[in-house]
UniProtKB/Swiss-Prot annotation:
One of its GO terms (cellular component) is plasma membrane. It comes from Mus musculus (Mouse). Keywords: Disulfide bond, Endoplasmic reticulum, Glycoprotein, GPI-anchor biosynthesis, Magnesium, Membrane, Metal-binding, Transmembrane, Transmembrane helix. Component of the glycosylphosphatidylinositol-anchor (GPI-anchor) transamidase (GPI-T) complex that catalyzes the formation of the linkage between a proprotein and a GPI-anchor and participates in GPI anchored protein biosynthesis. Binds GPI-anchor. This is GPI-anchor transamidase component GPAA1.
Length: 621
């Protein structure tokens, strides 16, 4: 306390902070980026290991030999699904009853806020079919789920056939201690969400559905299966769920263990695992996989049916069969054995998966980065905002500091005069107008879509996207509006106070986002922090304005799409990137209203108004 109360010591501290602030900010930002890039290199990346004792060994004998039966079921399912987009409910009921399951159906309907042009649907109605295999050795207190999504674009026939063949095989075993639910959902994720809401007796997305007539125990784990052919060259696992949630790492370890036992090739993000981590090639390949995971997790989308289970505290994975040009191929029997082994191990669980990590990054299936090792990367970036805020606070408490002299230290003999206060009224206008623009960006595109279609020759989805872009660009005129209301006798102190508030606001937002979804928080911090630190109404304003625009949330999304496709080795042209950007905007809004994805409200109600504050600072008059 003596350091802050003594004027001489406080003046010395102010000199140090003002003199070293810029070098410390640069060093902190570089350290944050370097720390993130180093996550794919040992020792920051560690080998995965099984933490749950009940799943620590693969000493189970898989007996599934129903590959031919699975193919027969798949052919029958495809034959009965003659009408595109229609699920053969009656055939599924008969087939599930024939293998000894309790069979139930659930109808659901959903009117989307605007037409989904990607899947060509607006008024959605469908029927889910599920069968329950009751555990012969216990009461129905716990259960496992094997689910297959069926959408209008792909029938997923082989996955349905394998599900029915596994149900027939499981029915003949007596060692099950948990109920097993075999679920076939209509309309992909919409059917999955409808079933989950009905199973847990809640309604969070507005889907109208019939109540479930049959239930099993509390769901402990779930596996979603997607197969496009009778043979696969590899199984790709997807872990990223809604709003960046991840399943317990032990479930992923279990999948990898049984793939290795059965000789199945398993991939992550479509990438093979690096074999040599001692050379530079292995970590660099792991860095590509890690970046792909970061980009997918940051989107907040449910990248498979498993992503919706995670919201309900159910550990889940989505497995996709890949049939490429590789020489070695595996049939449905091999895939079925891996699934049988996983379910038999999950059957041993005495409690929910909780021993291993829930927050991690994956440079490979056999390597992970824990939360304690990746969070410092974001911490270094947020330190830049804290240092700049401290610098502004000290400048505001020094009398007679001009913007040109902000970086200069005062002479030792200069007394500290009473501080000229900056009234909160001078900051109220830009803060309120910025937040009002965020509210308009959040509400108007969906509310005004019908009005836009009446006056302009556009479809509803196009109207939503164009309204989004129009409101976003209209925010650039914000400084001209706020300056008419701001009346400060000391204009330099006005923009410094506004920037101080904006820096604290941005740091709090990014810190909270990073705790919930590290990937999103890091990407936003890596892009927004430099422009936020440099924004001021003096100096090369054109350069600062260009930097602010390039690092705005919308342009960050645009650039992330190019980076994502580049990492997938499917580069985009500028026209293709723009079209994909418009589609991503529409899907982001749609997934918020349909599934509760939070990326759109975070950007519209939080980061966009904050970005407008820095834009206001830049053009302060």
């Amino acid at each position: 306390m003596g350091l802050l109360s003594d004027p001489v010591r406080r003046r010395a501290l102010a000199r140090i902070v003002l003199r070293l602030n810029t070098p410390l900010c640069v060093l902190s930002y570089v350290a944050g980026i370097a720390w993130f890039l180093a996550l794919a290199f040992p020792p920051l990346t560690q080998r995965t290991y099984m933490s749950e004792n009940a799943m620590g060994s693969t000493m189970v004998e898989e007996q599934f030999v129903g590959g031919d039966r699975a193919r027969s079921f798949a052919r029958d399912f495809a034959a009965h699904r003659k009408k595109p987009g229609a699920l053969p409910v009656a055939w599924l009921e008969r087939s599930m009853r024939s293998v000894g399951l309790e069979v139930y159906t659930q109808s659901f309907s959903r009117k989307l806020p605007f037409p989904d042009e990607t899947h060509e649907r607006y008024m959605v109605s469908g029927t889910n079919v599920y069968g329950i295999l009751r555990a012969p050795r216990s009461a129905s207190t716990e259960s496992l789920v094997l689910t297959v999504p069926c959408g209008p674009d792909a029938t997923n026939s082989q996955a349905v056939g394998l599900l029915l063949a596994l149900a027939a095989h499981f029915r003949g075993q007596i060692y099950w201690a948990k109920d097993i639910i075999f679920l076939v959902t209509d309309h992909d994720l919409l059917g999955t969400e409808a079933w989950l809401e009905a199973y847990h007796d809640i309604n969070v997305t507005g889907i109208q559905s019939s109540p479930l007539q049959g239930r099993a125990g509390a769901i402990q784990a779930a596996v979603a299966l997607e197969l496009s052919s009778d043979v696969v060259t590899s199984l790709d696992v997807t872990v990223e769920g809604l709003n960046g949630q991840l399943p317990n790492l032990d479930l992923l370890n279990l999948f990898q263990t049984f793939c290795q036992k059965g000789g199945l090739l398993c991939t992550l993000q479509g990438k093979l695992q690096p074999q040599d981590w001692t050379s530079l090639e292995g970590p660099l390949q792991g860095l590509q996989t890690l970046l792909l995971m970061v980009l997918r997790q940051a989107s907040g989308r449910p990248h498979g049916p498993h992503g919706l289970f995670l919201r309900y505290g159910v550990e889940a994975l989505t497995l996709r069969g890949i049939n490429s040009f590789r020489q070695y191929k595996y049939d449905l029997a091999t895939v079925g054995k891996a699934l049988e082994g996983m379910f038999r191990k999950l059957n041993h669980l005495l409690e929910r998966l909780h021993q291993s990590f829930f927050f991690y990054l994956l440079p490979a299936l056999s390597r992970f980065v824990s939360i304690g090792l990746y969070m410092p990367a974001t911490g270094f970036l947020l330190l830049v905002l804290g240092l700049k805020a401290l610098e502004l606070w000290m400048q505001l408490h020094q009398a007679g500091v001009n913007p040109e002299e902000a970086g200069k230290a005062p002479s030792p003999g200069t007394p500290l005069l009473p501080t000229q206060g900056v009234g909160l009224a001078s900051l109220t206008a830009p803060l309120l107008i910025s937040q009002a623009m965020g509210l308009a960006l959040y509400f108007l595109p969906v509310l005004g879509q019908h009005l836009a279609t009446q006056h302009f020759p556009v479809a509803e989805a196009e109207a939503v996207v164009l309204t989004l872009l129009a409101i976003y660009v209209a925010g650039l005129a914000l400084p001209h509006n706020t300056h008419r209301v701001v009346n400060s006798q000391v204009p330099d102190r006005g923009w410094m106070a506004l920037k101080l508030v904006a820096l604290i606001y941005l740091a709090l937002q990014l810190g909270c986002i990073a705790l919930l979804n590290f990937s999103l928080g890091f990407l936003l911090a890596a892009t927004m922090v430099p422009a936020a630190a440099l924004a001021k109404p003096h100096g090369p304003r054109t350069l600062y304005a260009a930097l602010l625009v390039v690092t705005s949330p919308a342009v960050t999304l645009f650039g992330s799409l190019f980076l994502w496709r580049e990492l997938l080795e499917v580069p985009l042209s500028l026209a293709e990137g723009w079209q994909l950007f418009l589609t991503a905007l529409a899907q982001g809004v749609l997934e918020h209203y349909t599934y509760g994805a939070l990326l759109f409200p975070i950007l519209a109600l939080g980061l966009y108004p904050c970005w407008l504050l820095f834009w206001n600072v830049l053009f302060w008059k």
